[in-house]
């Protein structure tokens, strides 16, 4: 089954929605890592930083699988969606 970029956007929005403080706004860094296909270890480390609870192997694999199934073009396209989410009032208010 192919995962759509919308699904990836929702996953990142979910990660963002559970964040406090700077982590919500810093998700741009995570997004850049995903777009440019960094190593699994680095991606896992970055995801762990944004997750207030220990990142489970299952949750990491879900996110990793999501991004493994979309093209670089799609990753850039949904990055715009995530940036809009990050700039929304809900996300900004969570940072304060």
UniProtKB/Swiss-Prot annotation:
Principal localisation: secreted
Signal sequence residues: 1-23
Lineage top rank: taxon: Eukaryota
Keyword Metal-binding: no
Gene3D superfamilies: 1.20.920.50
Cellular localization per UniProt: Secreted
UniProt keyword list: Secreted, Signal
Pfam families registered for this protein in UniProt: Uteroglobin
Record InterPro entries: Secretoglobin, Secretoglobin_Domain_sf, Secretoglobin_sf
GO cellular component: extracellular region
Entry's family note: Belongs to the secretoglobin family.
Protein name: Secretoglobin family 2B member 2
Gene responsible for this protein: SCGB2B2
């Amino acid at each position: 089954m192919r995962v759509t970029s919308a699904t990836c956007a929702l996953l990142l929005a979910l990660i963002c929605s559970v964040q406090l403080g700077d982590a919500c706004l810093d998700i741009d860094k995570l997004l850049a890592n995903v777009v440019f296909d960094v190593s699994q270890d680095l991606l896992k480390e970055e995801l762990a930083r944004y997750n207030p609870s220990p990142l489970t192997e299952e949750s990491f694999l879900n996110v990793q699988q999501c991004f493994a199934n979309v093209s670089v073009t799609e990753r850039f396209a949904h990055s715009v969606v995530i940036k809009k989410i990050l700039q929304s009032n809900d996300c900004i208010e969570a940072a304060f």
